[in-house]
């Protein structure tokens, strides 16, 4: 895994979460669009950099199938990291009392959002790789 990609995915994940939670507050009647995240989420989102080497193995799969694979992987990562953070007493999310939750750590109804997020990370990582390749060809990297 490339550290540059880890850092960029961590930042992109934070941004996606802030936008997502902002829309959530708006849907609950708060027009201020207040979004939030946690510092704990940075390394979790940073792990999306693992999509880069995985993509090379599955790039010929249909787009939606790749998205479902990413979403399943993300939800597994969410469950494992959430379980560890809960054990340490610092888990920033708790889905207990919401529909379709698993142990209050994962929400199955978020699967479509994770499909989109996984594919967004794939596109971001492809862009970064192509940009680096183009700069290298020009002798700028």
Residue ranges and their predicted role:
Residues 1-141:
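Aromatic-rich, lipid-facing transmembrane alpha helices and their immediate juxtamembrane interface loops
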């Amino acid at each position: 895994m490339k550290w540059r990609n880890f850092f960029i995915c961590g930042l992109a994940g934070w941004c996606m979460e802030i936008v997502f939670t902002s829309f959530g507050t708006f849907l609950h009647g708060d027009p201020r669009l207040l979004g939030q995240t946690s510092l704990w989420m940075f390394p979790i989102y940073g792990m999306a950099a693992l999509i880069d080497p995985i993509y090379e193995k599955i790039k010929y799969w249909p787009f939606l199938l790749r998205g479902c694979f990413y979403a399943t992987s993300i939800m597994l990562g969410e469950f494992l990291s959430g379980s560890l953070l809960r054990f340490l007493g610092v888990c920033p999310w708790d889905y207990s009392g919401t529909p379709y939750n698993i142990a209050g750590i994962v929400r199955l109804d978020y699967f479509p959002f994770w499909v989109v997020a996984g594919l967004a990370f794939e596109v971001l990582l492809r862009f970064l790789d192509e940009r680096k390749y183009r700069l290298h060809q020009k002798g700028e990297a």
